[in-house]
Amino acid sequence: MMNFFNFRCIHCRGNLHIAKNGLCSGCQKQIKSFPYCGHCGSELQYYAQHCGNCLKQEPSWDKMVIIGHYIEPLSILIQRFKFQNQFWIDRTLARLLYLAVRDAKRTHQLKLPEAIIPVPLYHFRQWRRGYNQADLLSQQLSRWLDIPNLNNIVKRVKHTYTQRGLSAKDRRQNLKNAFSLAVSKNEFPYRRVALVDDVITTGSTLNEISKLLRKLGVEEIQVWGLARA
C-alpha cells in the first residue's frame, strides 16, 4: 500500500514510502541477521546444523530460528511491544520472524511445522499486561503460513519470578513444575511443532516446555524467537 496517509516508521518516525510492515528500509537494514547454529542459536562464522556449544550442553529442542541479536533497534521494538503496551507492533515483529523462518528453510533446511505453540504467560501476568506477546506473534504467523496456532496446549500453572537477572541454575529452579499440558498424548496428532518466544537467553523456559511436548509424542521441536540475548 502506497503511503497516501503520511504513515511513519514505528522506530525512527520517518516517512514510509510503502506503508506495509511499519519499518522504513533504513531501520530494517539496521536489524542484521548473522550466521548461527540451527540447533541452539549460538552465533557462528557460518551457518551450521550443530556447534560445539549445543554438543556440550544439548538443548531439549531440535531447531532454532532467530531474527538477530538483542540489540538496537530490535531490542527497542521488543521492549515497546512487551512492556509499553504497544501490542500493535506484533505485525512488524512477526513479519521479521516470518522472513527469518523463510531464510532458515534455505540456510538450515528447515521444514515448516504442523502447528505453532506460543510460550504461555501465567494468567495473572497476562491479565496485568493485557495480552501474551508470544501469542500475538503466533496468530500472525499462523495466518501467513496457514498453520494452526495452539495457544491452549501448554499452560503456565505456577507464578515465577521474572527470569531477568537470574543465573542459569536459578532459572531452572524458578521454572520447576511451572508448566502443564492441557491434552493427552492420544489427543495430540502433531509430530513437528514450533515454539514461539520473544527473547531467548539461556533457553530454560523452552527446555521445560520441550520436555513436556516430548510426552505428547512430538518428534521435532523448533524454537522461533525474535532475538538471541
UniProtKB/Swiss-Prot annotation:
Pfam families named in the record: Pribosyltran (PF00156)
Keyword Manganese: no
SUPFAM superfamilies reported in the protein's UniProt record: PRTase-like
UniProt entry tagged with the keyword Ribonucleoprotein: no
GO annotation terms (biological process): establishment of competence for transformation
Superkingdom per UniProt: Bacteria
Annotated function: Involved in transformation (genetic competence for DNA uptake).
Family: Belongs to the ComF/GntX family.
Protein name as it appears in the record: Competence protein F
Species for this entry: Haemophilus influenzae (strain ATCC 51907 / DSM 11121 / KW20 / Rd)
Primary gene name: comF
